[in-house]
């Protein structure tokens, strides 16, 4: 649901404490101890008539954040984004020794430890690379810094399609010569060598954190497929263990070899992007069908051993890479087979049918059955459903969909969350089947400009503040409430709490940390906050 567009006056200006606090008398009372910080570079807001604003960036200017630092012991930092136009604005406050608030109490339970986080990121598709490289070099650099640098939101995961997908401008694989079972003609095209690989290297150079690469194939070469086409209903010819399956498994190793020659190593591969898609007649773009039994046997007999016996034996293998609706069934089929299970490190999930599949019955049940197999959210975007507008520049609701999904996933044992295209054009492409969708960054090459959407900042409320190795801990509410909340601890023991308010009501609240005291604050309607403090 969209809401009325904010006026220019609602958008952020470099303003004093009085202006910032004037929006809420309750906020003024609760946060009187808070001093507002003015560092970094503010958002230049622009409204396109949707519920909030985008931040405008070009070759000479882009909003930015200061590198992450924790406040002194006894104080806390609060980063705030709101529908009315604030974007990760920093304030600091004093942790109180006594509880004076009367509203909601959130109590940190650090002794309750859950999963350790892998991280957050997005996909370097052909479309994303084309859009980024269509900007002038200075604008390209500011876009990449926004995502990957410590002045940005600190992404540490990049998903890389293995050859073409729908977000390509042509269909291709790395081995299109028919019946080349030895893959003698395997080669990376310019989409990899001129577009994706150089940009990935630039991202890695800008990042202060280690960045993990994740690869996923959409289709095999057509000569390995039952239908002889990149799209539509089709799977690998033959049976697991035969020449078709062995060749397809070796294709993964060839891909990893080729990227290694370009000095890029992968953290993980998924066995197939959306394997259920290739079981559907008339599926419009690149796919390769697997039933759970077929994927189990392909992993056990072909892909698992081939990776394990290669120089890439440290690369993790993730199964599924499809809708969580398919859980826990797919996990039961694959992971109860010891020959397949020994090669599987994790289960990747997509978000598109989450509205049909409650997290507890899918993610929760799968974790209960297979607690040692990690869950990882590998793809999400808005605007893909037939009833949705592809791009809604400045949609706050779409940002809230992202942060609500991330919090829900974290609460159900997921270790990372990956967006889809890093950047798209105002149409939501390019996409060779016109399957246009939205993206946290939209590039307008006619103006050498890019727009950072609310989705970008909602993601940043997690990615910047929750580094790899952070661990989710308990957080208990004193009463039923409309907030989405999650708590984590950094590897050094510092605390992070994210609070999302998807309602229109301001919610006074107190965060209690038994080790240090009480954080008195407020969650305004349609806002997201990240709180940080030292515990020792």
UniProtKB/Swiss-Prot annotation:
It catalyses: a beta-D-glucosyl-(1<->1')-N-acylsphing-4-enine + H2O = an N-acylsphing-4-enine + D-glucose; a beta-D-galactosyl-(1<->1')-N-acylsphing-4-enine + H2O = an N-acylsphing-4-enine + D-galactose; cholesteryl 3-beta-D-glucoside + H2O = cholesterol + D-glucose; a beta-D-glucosyl-(1<->1')-N-acylsphing-4-enine + cholesterol = cholesteryl 3-beta-D-glucoside + an N-acylsphing-4-enine. The keyword Glycoprotein applies. Glycans are attached at residues 58, 98, 185, 309, 501. One of its GO terms (cellular component) is lysosomal membrane. The keyword Cell membrane does not apply. It is a peripheral membrane protein. GO terms for biological process: autophagy; cholesterol metabolic process; glucosylceramide catabolic process; lipid glycosylation; lysosome organization; regulation of TOR signaling. SUPFAM superfamilies: (Trans)glycosidases, Glycosyl hydrolase domain. Disulfide bonds join 43-55, 57-62. The active site is at residues 274, 379. It is found in: Lysosome membrane. GO terms for molecular function: galactosylceramidase activity; glucosylceramidase activity; glucosyltransferase activity; steryl-beta-glucosidase activity. Its EC number is 3.2.1.45, 2.4.1.-, 3.2.1.-, 3.2.1.46. Residues 1-39 form the signal peptide. Pathway: Steroid metabolism; cholesterol metabolism; Sphingolipid metabolism. Glucosylceramidase that catalyzes, within the lysosomal compartment, the hydrolysis of glucosylceramides/GlcCers (such as beta-D-glucosyl-(1<->1')-N-acylsphing-4-enine) into free ceramides (such as N-acylsphing-4-enine) and glucose. Plays a central role in the degradation of complex lipids and the turnover of cellular membranes. Through the production of ceramides, participates in the PKC-activated salvage pathway of ceramide formation. Catalyzes the glucosylation of cholesterol, through a transglucosylation reaction where glucose is transferred from GlcCer to cholesterol. Interacts with saposin-C. Interacts with SCARB2. Interacts with TCP1. Interacts with GRN; this interaction prevents aggregation of GBA1-SCARB2 complex via interaction with HSPA1A upon stress. Belongs to the glycosyl hydrolase 30 family. PANTHER family: GLUCOSYLCERAMIDASE (PTHR11069), LYSOSOMAL ACID GLUCOSYLCERAMIDASE (PTHR11069:SF23). This is Lysosomal acid glucosylceramidase. It comes from Pongo abelii (Sumatran orangutan). The gene is GBA1.
């Amino acid at each position: 649901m969209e809401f009325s567009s904010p006026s220019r006056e609602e958008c952020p200006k470099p303003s004093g404490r009085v202006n910032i606090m004037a929006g809420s008398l309750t906020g003024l009372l609760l946060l009187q101890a808070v001093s507002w910080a003015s560092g970094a570079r503010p958002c230049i807001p622009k409204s396109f008539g949707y519920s909030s604003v985008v931040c405008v960036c070009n070759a000479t200017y882009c909003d930015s954040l200061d590198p992450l630092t924790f406040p002194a012991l006894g104080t806390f930092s609060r980063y705030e984004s709101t529908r009315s136009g604030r974007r990760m604005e920093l304030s600091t406050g004093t942790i109180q020794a006594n509880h004076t608030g009367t509203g909601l109490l959130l109590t940190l339970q650090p002794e309750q430890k859950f999963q350790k986080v892998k991280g957050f990121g997005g996909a370097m598709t052909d479309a994303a690379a084309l859009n980024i490289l269509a900007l002038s070099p200075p604008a390209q650099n500011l876009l990449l810094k926004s995502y990957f640098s410590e002045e940005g939101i600190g992404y540490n995961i990049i998903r890389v399609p293995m050859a073409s997908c729908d977000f390509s401008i042509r269909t291709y694989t790395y081995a299109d010569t028919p019946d080349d079972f030895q893959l003698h003609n395997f080669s990376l095209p310019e989409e990899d060598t001129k577009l994706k690989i150089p940009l990935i290297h630039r991202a890695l150079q800008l990042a202060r954190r280690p960045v993990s690469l994740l690869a996923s194939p959409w289709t095999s070469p057509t000569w390995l497929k039952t239908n002889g086409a990149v799209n539509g209903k089709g799977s690998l010819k033959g049976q697991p263990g035969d020449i078709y399956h062995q060749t397809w498994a070796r294709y993964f190793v060839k891909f990893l070899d080729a990227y290694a020659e370009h000095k890029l190593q992968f953290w993980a591969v998924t066995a197939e992007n959306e394997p259920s898609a290739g079981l559907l007649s008339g599926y419009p773009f690149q796919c390769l069908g697997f039933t759970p039994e077929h994927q189990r046997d392909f992993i056990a007999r072909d892909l698992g051993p081939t990776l394990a016996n290669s120089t890439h034996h440290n690369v993790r293998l993730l199964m599924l890479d499809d809708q969580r609706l398919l859980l826990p069934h797919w996990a039961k089929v694959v992971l109860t087979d010891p020959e397949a299970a020994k090669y599987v490190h994790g289960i990747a999930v997509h978000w598109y049918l989450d509205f049909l599949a409650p997290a507890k019955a899918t993610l929760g049940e799968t974790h209960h059955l297979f607690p040692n197999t990690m869950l990882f959210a590998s793809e999400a975007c808005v605007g893909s459903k037939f009833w949705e507008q592809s791009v809604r520049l400045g949609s706050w609701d779409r940002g809230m969909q992202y942060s609500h999904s991330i919090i829900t996933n974290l609460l159900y044992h997921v270790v990372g969350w990956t967006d889809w295209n890093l950047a798209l054009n105002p149409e939501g492409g390019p996409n060779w089947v016109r399957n246009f969708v939205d993206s946290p960054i939209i590039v307008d090459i006619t103006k050498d400009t890019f727009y950072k959407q609310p989705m970008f900042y909602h993601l940043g409320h997690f990615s910047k503040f929750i580094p790899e190795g952070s661990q989710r801990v308990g957080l208990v509410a004193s009463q039923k409430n409309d907030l989405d909340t999650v708590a984590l601890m950094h590897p050094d023991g510092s605390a992070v709490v994210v609070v999302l308010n998807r309602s229109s009501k301001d919610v006074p609240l107190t965060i209690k940390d038994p080790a240090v005291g009480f954080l008195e604050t407020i969650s305004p309607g349609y806002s997201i906050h990240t709180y940080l403090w030292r515990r020792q």
